[in-house]
């Protein structure tokens, strides 16, 4: 999943929240992030409204990132060009005992990204790689 959390009273706005959470969870210093803007709000399965904020960092910043052990298992990159590939996103439908589930899976290297994170990436993909007329 992506770094994130609740708006705290100390946060000026949702961008400040995103930057604070990224610093707390993966040691990403706010000063090295170029904020590009927000994506569409997404409702989590628990009913929370999540406002994704998109930022860009330089490649050399990745080596400085450190996961907060109590919150983050690992940190990995997903090249933007990977989002444009037709085989990256898969729509999965699973039948459960009492209901069916449908969700996106983003396949990348040793990681499968799914759920809310995959929905956010799908929104980003649709904005970056819109069909040309």
Please state what every model-predicted region is.
Residues 117:
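NAD(P)-dependent dehydrogenases' Rossmann-like dinucleotide-binding region
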């Amino acid at each position: 999943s992506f770094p994130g959390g609740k708006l705290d009273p100390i946060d000026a706005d949702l961008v400040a929240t995103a930057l604070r959470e990224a610093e707390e969870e993966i040691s990403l210093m706010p000063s090295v992030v170029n904020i590009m803007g927000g994506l569409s709000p997404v409702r989590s399965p628990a009913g929370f409204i999540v406002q994704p904020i998109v930022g860009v960092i330089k490649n050399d910043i990745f080596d400085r990132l450190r996961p907060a052990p109590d919150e983050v298992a690992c940190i990995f990159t997903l090249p933007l060009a990977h989002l444009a590939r037709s085989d990256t996103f898969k729509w999965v439908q699973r039948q459960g005992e009492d209901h069916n589930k449908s969700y996106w899976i983003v396949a990348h290297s040793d990681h499968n990204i799914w759920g809310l994170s995959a929905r956010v990436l799908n929104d980003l993909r649709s904005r970056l790689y819109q069909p040309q007329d």
